Amino acid sequence: MDAKDISFIQDQIGYNFKNTDLLQQAFVRRSYSHENGGENNEVLEFIGDKVLDFIVVKLLSDKFGYTKGELDDFDSENDWDEYACDYCENKLTEIKKQLVQKQNLATCIDELGLAEYLIMGKSDQKQHADEQPSVKEDLFEAILGAVAIDSGWNLEKLQDTVELMLKPETTLEEDDEDNYVALIQEWCSKETGNIPLYHFEEGSYQATWYMPFDGISQNCNVLGSPEYNKLMASTHRCLLKIADDIPIFRGFGKSKSEARKNVCRLAYEWLDKNDRLHTIRNELENPNRNEAIGQLEILARRGYFTLPTY
């Protein structure tokens, strides 16, 4: 791994290592260490597996749980300030299972573009191990293990990294149309064949709004509005590049995950305004009435609707 590779990986996961050797170790398979000596990523994977479980449970508790004292109708004299949750244990277990299952972690690694950096021995190379979901799952967990060790088990940094790598909003958001991170991922895949490139920085909107920026930046000129107050309270910013012929976007948030969500919304709204969104018409080379039946069959095969039965 060279400095450029390390910089790219750190940008994608939103964490800068003090000890970049730990980051590289997260990518080393046992097959490589067996042939060349040194350590591999297996213990880091074990650590990361436990980190992932803990952070996902915390995310679910933060989103769906509450103490009754937070409710408007809470009566401190007659009610107990107990912990409650919108979902029962079985439902929470089901959601957690969806988030941490092998295929989901493998998909996240693909969307981050990290599998190609795996350091493998000859046996793994022959078997194309970097294409196997279980190997990508191991890599996901090993990266979290490396972050845990490097950060001194810093809970905030671990949660930031899990949120950025796992994209839990993809599973937790009820309205897919509001999941701008997933929508930008899909746009990049269809339009450029590449992944969106993120770069995270610590810094508030308040400290940077007046500085020149060669791109499209999240902004709000309505003083005192909820959106303005959120911007002023931001502590992180995220830069996003989706294509060479499209400006760089910049968003802000109280967390890296929120900044990413805001910059993706900004980018998606720009694409919509500038007629750059992929629509159903893009699926057909030459939409016309004469070939309507055949073109409807094409769209049905691509999942836009189901064919009628007669």
Question: Model-predicted segments: where are they?
Answer:
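Double-stranded RNA-binding/processing signature
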Residues: 1-310
